[in-house]
Amino acid sequence: MLKKYSWKVLSVVMLLLNAWWIFQTFQYDHYQEPLGKITMVKKVEKTDTVDEHQNKDIISTQQIHLTLLSTENKGKELTILNKFSQSRIKDQEYKIGDLVFLSIKDNDFSQATIIDSKRDTGLAILMLGFVLLLIVIGRKSGVASLIGLLINTGLFYLLLILYEHVSSQSLIWLSLLFFPIIVTSTLIVSNGWNQKTKISILTTLCSTLITFVLGVSIITLLKHKGLRYEEMELITRPQHVLFISSLLIGTMGASMDISITLSTAMNEIAQRHKQLTPQSLYQSGIQVGSEVIGPMINIMFFSYLSGSIPLILIFLRNDMSFNYTFPISLSLEMTRALIGSIGIILTIPITSYIASIFLTRGNQHER
């Protein structure tokens, strides 16, 4: 897909853009909120607290001295009190050298408060490391992956923009419209337009649609029983519509991953063994799929469930029962993981069957 030198040019452009982003994070006057740098910290008070569940915590008070780095009052020294708990659930402790965003109303510096830490510099450096490693290790494939990521980000942003101007119930149809575009663009950019890509696109579309229809049908027949939408209670759009749309996106990612892995392996087998019959190649595909299905499903479950660990610990720490904690915090994630895993399982025979037909078509004519 990428010519001999074009990927090197694109690599340099991406690295320069990332370096420019890092440079911009040090241009403090570009931020809307006033920015300050902490120069001295002193703990002035510490109080033990116990809540109604006998959970113990310690509330500490810091006296923070900082210097303004932006606005017309740049260089002005401020002193602010900051309270933080030992648990750090809703607050945090600040240290010397931290950069923080401030809230200053009507230039009343005596009432200034800290909004949050400035973290974008670290994020930009982390992104630079990600891009650099992807280019160094992946080379042309790495650059293609970055381009695909940018295209998909743009498509997803366009999807959200369109959703703002249509009815609340239309997100599912918009997702169904965009998902073949995302699949096609991702695979073509990553692998070029070839037999392997055609197989991957076709099998991803088939397995994703079958899994999505199966999952939505079961959820609808059960009338959404067992699904706890409390974690989405602040959303003003229909929660079940957003959840069902997320099922499509998650299933698409899982199916695409296993499909390209399997079609690549089967294409390699077909290239090395020209006389393979469709049945033999199909069995080879099933065997390869059985080797990767375990790790793929584990990745699916851990990636979905890991995000709920903090909420589970908070609930259990506050004497919530297991019977209450796990359904309310894991029902949606578990459903996403289960349906995504079904997609992985179905993708293996679908990809093996379609690939065995496409990749042995010439062999049958020769015989």
Task: Name every feature range the model reports, one short phrase each.
Residues G129-V131, K140-G250, A254:
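Transmembrane alpha-helical segments that form the functional core of multipass membrane systems
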Residues L35-Y94:
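Membrane-cytosol interface segments
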Residues L102-I115, F130-G142, I161-S167, E268:
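Short juxtamembrane and helix-loop transition motifs at transmembrane-helix boundaries
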Residues D257, M266-I312:
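Helical hairpin unit composed of two closely spaced alpha helices linked by a short loop
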Residues S85-T121:
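Extended, hydrophilic extramembrane loops/domains of integral membrane proteins
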Residues Q287, E291-G294, F302-R367:
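Hydrophobic alpha-helical transmembrane segments of membrane transport and translocation systems
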Residues L81, F109-T113, K223-E233, F322-T325:
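Membrane-interface helix termini and inter-helical loops of multi-pass transporters
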